[in-house]
Structures are given as C-alpha cells and as structure tokens.
C-alpha cells in the first residue's frame, strides 16, 4: 500500500505560477510516453497539442464556470467575517464556509460586501446554509470576488476574472477552475475541429475541497469531499462512437477524469453500460484503480501529497510521474493552476509500491 509520503516532493517556491501567461497557449506541455522504459519525456509548447493527438480522438472538457464566491462582511456585532460559497443549493440558498472569531448561529444575519444581508440557516458540516434575499447567482456575480487558490499570493484582479475561467465555461457553480482547460483558446479549438478531433463537454462543479490537504499517512483512511457532476447523453454517445472507430478518449483535466470514471464505475457496479448521469461523487483514485473510460489525460502539475497527484500517479504510474516531475523541476516548468501542462497516457499494468 502506498502512503502519503510516497507522494511528497520538494518544489522550489519560485516555480509556483502566480499569474497567467500573456497567451493561453504559451504554456509548456510535457508529453509523457511510458510505452518505453524509461519513460520518454518530450518538452513541447501547448500550441503543439494537435500534433500529439489523432483525428477521431475525443477531447472531454468540463464546462463549469467559477463563481465570484468570496465575500468579506460583518456580523451585526461588527465582527469581521470571510465567506466562501461552496455550492449553490437552490435559487436563494447556498452552502458556505465562514471564517469568523466565533461561528454564527442559526438565525444570525450577516452583511456581505456592504451590499446585502444573508441569514444563517442549519449547519451542514463543515458548511453553513445561507439564505439570500434575491437569487444567489445574481448577487454572487454582482458583489462577490473571484476565489483564487491559496497558493496564489495576490487578490483577484480584472485579468484573473478572464484568465481563471476557461473560454468555454458556461455553467456557473465552481469555486475553483478546471485548470487544464485554461490552456485552450478559440484558435486552438478551431484547429482541433479542423483536423477531425471530436469535442464534448460535461459539468463538474469544483468545490473548495479540491484544496483540502490529506492529513493521514495511510491514504486509505482519507475521506474525499463530494462534488456534483452532470454527464449528458450526448457525451455517452460520443464515447461509444470513439470506441467504435478506435479513437482515444482524452480527459481535459482531473475533474473531467473524475466525472467520467465515477459514472463508469457506478454503471459497472450496477452491471449496465455507461449512461447519462447526474450525481454526487467522492471518487478517490489512487494507484491500483482500474480505469474504465479515459485513455489519455491533459493535466497541470499538482501539489505534493495531494489527491490529484495520487490520481495522475494511478493513471500513468508512480515511477513515471516521479520521473516527469523531477524533469519538470529541472527544466523550470511552472506549477499549479496558472502553470504548465502534461499529456499522459494510461498505464494498464498497476504498480506495486517499492519495498
């Protein structure tokens, strides 16, 4: 069994990308080919992605849109608070994290952004239910701030409001971006279309739990956060057509991967084929997992000891990912949300931990 320490590495802090590059496709792309030993690592630019995939392949994108989910405000007593919307649960209700000197009780009124009041409802650990006086999405968009990841050290500005969204984001509901998609611009998508690469979308609303650290050495004891996803019938049909013509299903980002594999695992366990699905998932993919749908993965470089590093290690192989990350650090790749990307291929032979 792998432990948390197996997924640790030393990352020079200056390699954590603090801002987006001027052009989305200006990022670098590390293509990882583990069909040879040792794995072949090819340094590319992201704009070269079309040369790495084939006509008839299917790219699966997550079309979630990041909410302006961060608010600063105060209690009736004048005490300062910070609120992060975790998810919208109804037209006028949402779940949120609240930072305050003392947790507010049910019935408490909070003033947000000096613009409107919300009422605290029941506690749904670790979140609070908030009741909004007008439709949540309207007030969030008008008065909230974009919630950048904790390792980005500046407050969101006008540039972030554009660059921390994918160009195809259309379904508001996330509190973090599906960052592998940030590298795609419209000209690149048009090039992929022209060469016969298929595209499809699903929705997974990324929650704040994506930044939750793993606090147990035995990773089997870690409990994943839950996120809502929607896998439409049009995507199911495109996956079937891709399989029929011998193409690859390529997930753009770990969120697309998690939604696809969650739906496929549920179908497998029920003894039925993949079908359109709307559900919650807390799928936790670690080495030894049997992948059912995804053949290749476009992804960014992830945090040490993170569940996403475990996911890519399960997909491409622990030793392959270790070698790729060593190479990326040596070659000064940019890491995390605004960083560079990798193109991985599924390893079909599970690895055992080293003695």
UniProtKB/Swiss-Prot annotation:
Q: Name one GO molecular function term.
A: S-adenosylmethionine:tRNA ribosyltransferase-isomerase activity
Q: How does it assemble?
A: Monomer.
- Please explain the role this protein plays, according to its UniProt record: Transfers and isomerizes the ribose moiety from AdoMet to the 7-aminomethyl group of 7-deazaguanine (preQ1-tRNA) to give epoxyqueuosine (oQ-tRNA).
> Which sequence ranges are marked TM in the entry?
none
Location (main, coarse): cytoplasm
Give the lineage.
Answer: Bacteria, Pseudomonadati, Pseudomonadota, Betaproteobacteria, Burkholderiales
Keywords linked to the UniProt accession: Cytoplasm, Queuosine biosynthesis, S-adenosyl-L-methionine, Transferase
BP GO terms, sorted: queuosine biosynthetic process; tRNA wobble guanine modification
Q: Does the keyword Transferase apply?
A: yes
The Gene Ontology CC terms held by the record are: cytoplasm
* Similarity comment text for this entry: Belongs to the QueA family.
> Subcellular localization, per the record?
Cytoplasm
**InterPro entries in the record:** QueA, QueA_dom1, QueA_dom2, QueA_sf
User: What is the official name of this protein in its record?
Assistant: S-adenosylmethionine:tRNA ribosyltransferase-isomerase
- The EC category is transferase
Q: Give the pathway listed in the UniProt entry for this protein.
A: tRNA modification; tRNA-queuosine biosynthesis
Recorded hits in HAMAP family, A to Z, give:
QueA
Organism in which the protein naturally occurs: Burkholderia ambifaria (strain MC40-6)
């Amino acid at each position: 069994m792998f432990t948390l320490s197996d997924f640790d590495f030393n990352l020079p802090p200056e390699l954590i990308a603090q801002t987006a590059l001027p052009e989305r496709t200006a990022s670098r792309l590390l293509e990882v080919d583990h069909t040879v030993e040792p794995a072949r690592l090819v340094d590319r630019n992201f704009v070269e992605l079309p040369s790495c995939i084939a006509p008839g392949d299917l790219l699966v994108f997550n079309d979630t849109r990041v909410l302006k989910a961060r608010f600063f405000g105060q209690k009736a007593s004048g005490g300062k608070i910070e609120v992060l919307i975790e998810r919208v649960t109804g037209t006028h209700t949402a779940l949120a994290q609240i930072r305050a000197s003392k947790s507010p009780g049910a019935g408490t009124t909070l003033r947000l952004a000096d613009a409107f009041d919300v009422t605290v409802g029941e506690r749904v650990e670790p979140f609070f239910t908030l009741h909004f006086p007008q439709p949540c999405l309207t007030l969030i968009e008008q008065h909230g701030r974009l919630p950048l990841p904790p390792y980005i050290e500046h407050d969101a500005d006008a540039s972030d409001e554009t660059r921390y969204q994918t160009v195809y984001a259309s379904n508001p509901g996330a509190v973090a971006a599906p960052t592998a998609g940030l590298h795609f611009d419209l000209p690149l998508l048009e090039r992929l279309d022209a060469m016969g690469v298929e595209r499809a979308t699903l929705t997974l609303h990324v929650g704040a739990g994506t930044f939750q650290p793993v606090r147990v050495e035995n990773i089997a004891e870690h409990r994943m956060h839950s996120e809502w996803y929607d896998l439409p019938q049009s995507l199911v049909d495109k996956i079937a057509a891709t399989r029929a013509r011998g193409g690859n299903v390529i997930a753009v980002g770990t969120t697309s991967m998690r939604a696809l594999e969650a739906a496929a695992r549920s179908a497998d366990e029920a003894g039925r084929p993949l079908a359109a699905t709307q559900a919650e998932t807390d799928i936790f993919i670690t080495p030894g997992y049997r992948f059912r749908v995804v053949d290749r993965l476009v992804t960014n470089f992830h945090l040490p000891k993170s569940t996403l590093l475990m996911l890519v290690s399960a997909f491409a192989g622990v030793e392959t990912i270790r070698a790729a990350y060593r190479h990326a650090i040596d070659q000064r790749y940019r890491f995390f949300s605004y960083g560079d990307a990798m193109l991985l291929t599924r390893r079909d032979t599970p690895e055992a931990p080293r003695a």
